[in-house]
Structures are given as C-alpha cells and as structure tokens.
Amino acid sequence: MFGSHLSIAGSMVNALNEGEKLGFDCVQVFTKNQQQWKAKPLDEGMVREWLARTRELAWDSGGPDGRGGIVSHASYLINLASINDDLWRKSVDLMTDEIHRCETLAIPYLVHHPGSFVGSDLPTGLQRIEDAYAELFRRTKGFRTVSCLEGTVGAGSTIGGRFEHLAEMRERIAARTASPDRIAFCLDTCHLHAAGYDLSTRDQGRAVLAEFDQRCGLKNLKVLHVNDSKGKAASKLDRHEHIGEGWIGGAVKAHAGTGTYSLARLKKSGFAAFMAHPGLARIPKILETPKVNDPKGKPYDLTNLRRLKLLSTPNP
C-alpha cells in the first residue's frame, strides 16, 4: 500500500480525492490544525462524507489489520514524556482528542512521536509515557484505533531513536494497560538512517529490518514513512529528501547535500530491501517528502511513487 501525507484544506475528504488522483491506495492526514492545542469538533456532515468516500474507494479494508491503511499523524505539540506537569496534562488531553477523532473517522492508525525528556532523564521520560498511556487507554476504553510510536532520529533528549527504547515503551504500555493490540510502531526511513541505522545498501536495509524484528517484532509495525534523507547516517538530522536523491538512495554530491537520481543506485539501497520485504507488503507506506513539482512540472509524489513501485518486487 502506498500513500502520502496530504492536506485537508477545505475539507478532509479533499485528501482522499487527491490521493486517488495521484494513484495512491491510502493516505496520511492531520485531523485538525496540528499547531493548535484546541480544535473544533468534527463536523457531522464532513464525517459522513469522509466515511462514505473511504468506502467508495475501498480504503476501509485491506492493510495490516484488514481495516485499510489510512493514517493520522498526531500534533507535534504533544509531549507525553514531559516532566512539566502542565505540558504533560495538556499533551494527554490533546492525544485523547486525537484518538477520539480517529475513532470517529474510522482511521485505524494514529502515529505520534514518543516525546522528549527535557529537564529529566530517559527512565523518567519512559515512565511519563507509560503513565500517559494508562490514562489515555482508560479514557478511550474499547476504542479500536491503534497508537503507533514513531521512531525518531534520537537527537538530544528525544526518545525513540533506538529500537530497544521503542520495544521497552510498547512492552510497558501493553503490560500496564492490558491492551497490546492498541499500541504498535511506525518507522521512518529518514529517521532510521539519521539515527544510525544505516540504510545505504540493500544488505544494510535487510539487517536493520532483521534487528527491528528481533527487538520489536515486525508484526507490530503498522506504518512505514518512506523518505530519503538529507543527512548522512547517524547525523541526527531530521530532514526529508525525495526518493533516490538523498543519502539513502541517491548518489549524493560531496558537501552539496543534493542528490542525483540513479535507478541502478536506488536498487542497491536500503529502500530495495524495505520495498521487496514480504512482511511489509500490506503495510501503508507513506511519503512525507517535500510537496513540490519535479523538473517536468509534475507533482513529486508521482515521481516518488513510481520510483518506489520499481522496487516493489521480491529480490529486485
């Protein structure tokens, strides 16, 4: 399944229509203005339109759990690891609203960054996340939306840059809440590379997936963000590039940080391992690359989609 993070400007259903136009079979959206703590309630008419359109597109079925591959990304304001009680409470309240909105819209997956332990330490941050989820799942008992902890570049006090930390978070949340089916993972290829999980070659990509499977369980991966990286491996730089034009899949010009696309090079990169892996076939693969046109004047989403599909055969 392939999709992109698309705008809901005008109406949420516009993202579905744009996704269909671009040739995708899933999509990622914000369900509200992600830069604001408060949001208007979902309009009932818009909800009906959204649900009808997802059924019309058959985007409400398939995917890793048979519920389709539509994804929502939670607000970047949320920090469930914060030691600041006011920020933590606001984050829990906003995350609660995000879960409610996904449940109303029948969006199966809600991706969010775990948080940052500014002013404390990693053990404290992990405990705050566990406590947050205990409250979140208490407030949303019986909901079906799966919250996906996203791997990060691991810069500074940001949590999620190591597989062992992702695994520990999920294990603690699942044990505390007795809701293992509601907590899963999202990986981002750019974040992986920048965090130090080098994806420069196909063999390295296979090794990264094998390590993730061993530590976290590939069955718990529900969403994959597919982005090339403007930063080198272990750079801790969270900047996305078009597929085959960054430090993962492209022949990057020294010092310039700009890539020159080569299909031959792309086929030797970690992207080839990810796209051809049978365990990832039904997982929504979401582009979060810059929304610009390619040199031919066409949306770069089309170019990136075409490049990924060239790799989506076993053992390319």
Regions found by a protein language model. Give the residues of each.
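Active-site beta-loop-alpha junctions enriched in small/polar residues
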Residues: 5-9, 32-34, 75-77, 115-117, ...
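Non-cysteine beta-strand/loop elements that form the S-adenosyl-L-methionine
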Residues: 25-31, 68-72, 184-189, 218-230
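C-terminal helical cap(s) of enzyme catalytic domains, especially alpha/beta-barrels
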Residues: 294-314
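N-terminal pre-domain/capping segments
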Residues: 1-72, 80-100, 311-316
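Conserved, mostly hydrophobic/aromatic
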Residues: 19, 73, 91, 102, ...
